[in-house]
Amino acid sequence: MSLTVVSMACVGFFLLQGAWPLMGGQDKPFLSARPSTVVPRGGHVALQCHYRRGFNNFMLYKEDRSHVPIFHGRIFQESFIMGPVTPAHAGTYRCRGSRPHSLTGWSAPSNPLVIMVTGNHRKPSLLAHPGPLLKSGETVILQCWSDVMFEHFFLHREGISEDPSRLVGQIHDGVSKANFSIGPLMPVLAGTYRCYGSVPHSPYQLSAPSDPLDIVITGLYEKPSLSAQPGPTVQAGENVTLSCSSWSSYDIYHLSREGEAHERRLRAVPKVNRTFQADFPLGPATHGGTYRCFGSFRALPCVWSNSSDPLLVSVTGNPSSSWPSPTEPSSKSGICRHLHVLIGTSVVIFLFILLLFFLLYRWCSNKKNAAVMDQEPAGDRTVNRQDSDEQDPQEVTYAQLDHCVFIQRKISRPSQRPKTPLTDTSVYTELPNAEPRSKVVSCPRAPQSGLEGVF
């Protein structure tokens, strides 16, 4: 009797061991994806089927019963790399491991694994409220929104293999959005976030990712010190350098300025006094501002130290004492554009006046030259015509004085000049055996009959 009971108990144990996985027991494999379940279109993903008792062979299948040729009748070992992925690869997957000692030869189905393919719609926008720089223990709201009427929004942190958070989109004023609450913040929640959207009937075919948003947690390490060289008060145009230093061996220093969304970062350099320092050159000073610096380690780039004490940099000799904040209205930018227009208009007017002055000067010069030519005696012009008609190899050069300017003339011998005396009041002097030459002599005002100048 006891032997029969023992035999039946053994049979029941083996039957239960084979049936337990099929009944949803703990003896089922675990399916995971590396590097992430969120895969960009055209990318690759590695699917791994794990089993606590260990096996090397497994098979994959898709729950929506769509035909995937690469899975049909195939047995995989350790892992399977799927890609380049297309929208058809999006969906829910499971795996079964090979179990030689089970009744069916295969384990129970694994956990469902959702593979989401991105890049199928226009990207949404991601904002942080109250901001991306927060203290440990605070709560931040990440708002994902788009003018595309997405049914669901997904929030994913880079570097983790967990499924992204999912919320139903709310539509207001032609915009769909979802608010993801994260907190209380801890170092494990710091990192780079992106969000996606999906439309109805294609829940796992996601949009392109939003621009990355870094959520930084501060206040976990000792604060550094911030100083200015040559000092916090400088003249306009003077070079300024801000130095951030600490006894802690920070790898990176971050410099932020009030009113600016972006920070500057530099690698820390060990100094002789055993401090770690980074020097931020700001260049010629034009405007003042309030600065702070933080320290961080390379292993946790989004976990920063406490803020340094604020440092106010003042610039003297400059009418502006601060930069316009990016959150202020763009009226100041409009003033700059208006100033450029005024400067350009002034330059055009100046060039136009200069051109008019030049044309007027040319016109006056031409008019004066024409008046001088009109004042030349008729006899002198007649002599010139005769001179052109009769060419005598023996020529005499004369110089005519007219208003203290001697003008070169070439005429015939005196015997060939007209007999009628000329009324020209010009005075001539004969220069025999000399090369034709004209000489201009400046002289003071004198009677027209006088002759001044030396030949």
UniProtKB/Swiss-Prot annotation:
Coiled coil: none annotated. Residues 42-102, 137-202, 237-300 form the Ig-like C2-type domain. It is a single-pass type I membrane protein. Residues 22-340 are extracellular. One of its GO terms (biological process) is immune response-regulating signaling pathway. One of its GO terms (molecular function) is MHC class Ib protein binding. This is Killer cell immunoglobulin-like receptor 3DL2. The lineage of its organism: Eukaryota, Metazoa, Chordata, Craniata, Vertebrata.
